[in-house]
Every structure is written in C-alpha cells, then in structure tokens.
Amino acid sequence: MKIFAPGRFDRLPDAILFDTDNTLYPYDPAHTAAQQAVRNKVVNTFSIKPEVFDAAFKEARQQVKTRLKHTASSHSRLLYLQRMLEIMGLGSQVLLALDFEQTYWRTFLSNAVLFDEVKDL
C-alpha cells in the first residue's frame, strides 16, 4: 500500500471502525427480526394496524434519506422512528423514538449470528 502523507500516520489509531454487515454475519436475518420487533412494539403501543406502521415508517425513511442525502446519518434508525412518529401525528416523542431504536438494536444484535468461517478470538 502506498501512503501519500506518511506524516499523518505517525502513531497507531485509537480505534478502527469497519462495516461488519455481510462480512462477519448475515445482515438480512438480523435486520428482519429487528424491524419486526419494532413494528410489533409500535403496533401494540398505539393500537394501530401493521399497515399504518409500514406506511409511516416507509415515508419517514424516504424523507430522512432525501433530506440527508449521502451522509451516515441518513441511515439512522432513530431519525426514521422520530420522523415516523411525527408523520403519525404524535409530534416530537424523543423518549419513544429512543425506546423503539433500542428495541431495534437489541433485537438486531441478539440475532446477528457470526458466519461459521469467522474465527473465535
């Protein structure tokens, strides 16, 4: 590897971030389980039909992606869920949005199963 600015690499980094989706584990099963858990929680919390959740979430996701374009935050479940609550006429419900986001990630992580080829450290 050719380093064009060696002066910028005079020490080891404090942390390295990398995308693990479909590298260490399959993304789709974990995402599907997490999305279903959030859907169930929202449907039960507000006594709405699943289709209402589906439509509001889809619209919220599209609006966030359109507004934030190609930024990392355009993938934020928290922003999707907060906007979904607004679309549903519930206004700014930050604590609910956080609760729903935590449900997503808790379920996602508990369903993210490593590929067989991934070695134990």
What are the functions of these language-model segments?
Residues 2-18, 23-56:
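Active-site neighborhood of HAD-like aspartate-dependent phosphohydrolases
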